[in-house]
């Protein structure tokens, strides 16, 4: 990650409106990962990431910042909900499975990168195997060694037809590696580590065996290309790199952290909630977790926690956990102007998406400026009157607004005389005005 904080914020601005403080905090945290890697080895070990706590109502961009950050970071990234985990000893997943899942994500990410690198070599090898199946090499009169006439006119002709896709529907018999025998193991919750170890034990069964299959050329080419690419990837080197990537660049986003905060003096289930927080402490502070890659140290993994904190407060978290999340950023509730910008400014905005979807049926719609403004006002009003669900309210309103158009798109496209359907303030009021004014209806429909 060589992007500067300013560049990271600029990239996040393409997708998320407002919330500048949160964007700056994650941009600095991400850049600090790169800065740390430039330090001498002895000093590098001492520099630990400053974990972040994002506080803000639902639907204002907390999760979206995490999603976009994952794409920008090009680093092992995992998003989890704190509510999925339970204290060790209770039924449910234990928090160490976060690191095991992060390790799996790292292997998957690096394998995809490696397979992209060897793609051209794999395509060439796959092409030769398909041509061998289409044109079995002639055998010598004395001996078993096949003779492949690389430059034979027939082979070159078939190669050309194969590349042009003329042979895609032709069926061939080809030898491909058998898939390893998948073993489904059911274990009690909280024993994922044992499940993983048993699956690894049985993973090698049937590996290396080949069998002949009758496939269409297009399907065979894809299968053989993937097989050749997998053969070109060095698994041991891949695992070593994945282990380093998890330890040095891993990012974990823990959503709904407020749901495991203890609220007031209530008892009962809160015992398990506080237990989850205490189990998270060593993970965030730095400990060693056993994964299929080996022992993973969590000292330099960046943790970003977020929560709406409607019913609980950040101070309701156990003090030790508060101390391990030193950077606090508050995300603001959305204003009517923010809703207006969300509808038009981001890359692939909601209005752009709906227009493109209807365009596939030949129906053109156009969102007028006053229509967007009125839609933003209604979204804000409904959020104020009922439950505030942030930008997610726009999805509900747009579905309702365009319900009739979406249902009759094919018929309307045939009647359209070249003029697009204009979504202006009058159209918005006609379809949403009454619903927005009636609070009882708003609660159930919008």
UniProtKB/Swiss-Prot annotation:
* Stored Gene3D superfamilies: 1.10.8.60, P-loop containing nucleotide triphosphate hydrolases (3.40.50.300)
Q: Which residues bind ATP?
A: 17, 59-64, 255, 320, 392
Q: Which GO terms describe its biological process?
A: protein unfolding; proteolysis involved in protein catabolic process
In which broad location class does this protein mainly occur, judging by the first location in its UniProt entry?
Answer: cytoplasm
The cellular location(s) given in this protein's UniProt record come to: Cytoplasm
Q: Name one GO cellular component term.
A: HslUV protease complex
**Keyword 4Fe-4S in record:** no
Keywords assigned: ATP-binding, Chaperone, Cytoplasm, Nucleotide-binding, Stress response
Query: InterPro entries attached here?
Result: AAA+_ATPase, ATP-dep_Clp_protease_ClpX, ATPase_AAA_core, Clp_ATPase_C, HslU, P-loop_NTPase
One example GO MF annotation: ATP binding
Q: What does this protein do?
A: ATPase subunit of a proteasome-like degradation complex; this subunit has chaperone activity. The binding of ATP and its subsequent hydrolysis by HslU are essential for unfolding of protein substrates subsequently hydrolyzed by HslV. HslU recognizes the N-terminal part of its protein substrates and unfolds these before they are guided to HslV for hydrolysis.
Q: How does it assemble?
A: A double ring-shaped homohexamer of HslV is capped on each side by a ring-shaped HslU homohexamer. The assembly of the HslU/HslV complex is dependent on binding of ATP.
Question: NCBIfam families annotated for this entry?
Answer: hslU, PRK05201.1
Entry similarity comment: Belongs to the ClpX chaperone family. HslU subfamily.
What is the recorded name of this protein? ATP-dependent protease ATPase subunit HslU
Q: Which organism is it from?
A: Ectopseudomonas mendocina (strain ymp) (Pseudomonas mendocina)
Give the gene name.
hslU
């Amino acid at each position: 990650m060589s992007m500067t904080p300013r560049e990271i914020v600029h990239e996040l601005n393409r997708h998320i409106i407002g919330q500048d403080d949160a964007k700056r905090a994650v941009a600095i945290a991400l850049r600090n990962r790169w800065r740390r890697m430039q330090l001498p080895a002895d000093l590098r070990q001492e520099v630990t990431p400053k974990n972040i706590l994002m506080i803000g109502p639902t639907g204002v961009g907390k999760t979206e910042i995490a999603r976009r950050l994952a794409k920008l970071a090009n680093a092992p990234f995992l998003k989890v909900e704190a509510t999925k985990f339970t204290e060790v000893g209770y039924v449910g997943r234990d928090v160490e499975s976060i690191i095991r899942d992060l390790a799996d994500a790292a292997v998957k990410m690096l394998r995809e990168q490696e397979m992209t690198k060897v793609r051209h070599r794999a395509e060439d090898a796959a092409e030769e195997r398909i041509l061998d199946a289409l044109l079995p090499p002639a055998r010598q009169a004395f001996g078993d060694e096949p003779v492949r006439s690389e430059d034979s006119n027939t082979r070159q002709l078939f190669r050309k037809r194969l590349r042009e896709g003329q042979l895609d529907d032709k069926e061939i018999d080809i030898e491909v590696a058998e898939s390893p025998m998948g073993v489904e193991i059911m274990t009690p919750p909280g024993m994922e580590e044992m499940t993983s170890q048993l699956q690894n034990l049985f993973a090698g069964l049937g590996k290396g065996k080949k069998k002949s299959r009758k496939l269409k050329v297009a399907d065979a080419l894809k299968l053989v290309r993937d097989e050749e690419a997998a053969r070109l990837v060095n698994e041991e080197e891949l695992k070593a790199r994945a282990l380093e990537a998890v330890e040095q660049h891993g990012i974990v986003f823990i959503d709904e952290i407020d749901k495991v905060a203890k609220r007031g003096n209530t008892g009962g289930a809160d015992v398990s909630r506080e237990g989850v927080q205490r189990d998270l402490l060593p993970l965030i502070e730095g400990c060693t977790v056993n994964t299929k890659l080996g022992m993973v140290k969590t000292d330099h993994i960046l943790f970003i926690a977020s929560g709406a904190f409607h019913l609980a407060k950040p101070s309701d978290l156990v003090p030790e956990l508060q101390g391990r999340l030193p950077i606090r950023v508050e995300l603001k509730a959305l204003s009517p102007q923010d809703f207006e910008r969300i509808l038009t400014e981001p890359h692939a905005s909601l209005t752009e998406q709906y227009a493109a979807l209807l365009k596939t049926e030949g129906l053109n719609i156009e969102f007028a400026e006053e229509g967007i403004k009125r839609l933003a006002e209604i979204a804000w009003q409904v959020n104020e009157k009922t439950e505030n669900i942030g930008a997610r309210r726009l999805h509900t309103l747009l579905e309702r607004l365009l319900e009739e158009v979406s249902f009759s798109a094919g018929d309307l496209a045939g009647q359209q005389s070249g003029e697009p359907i204009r979504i202006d303030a009058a159209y918005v009021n006609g379809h949403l005005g009454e619903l927005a004014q009636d609070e009882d209806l708003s609660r159930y429909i919008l």
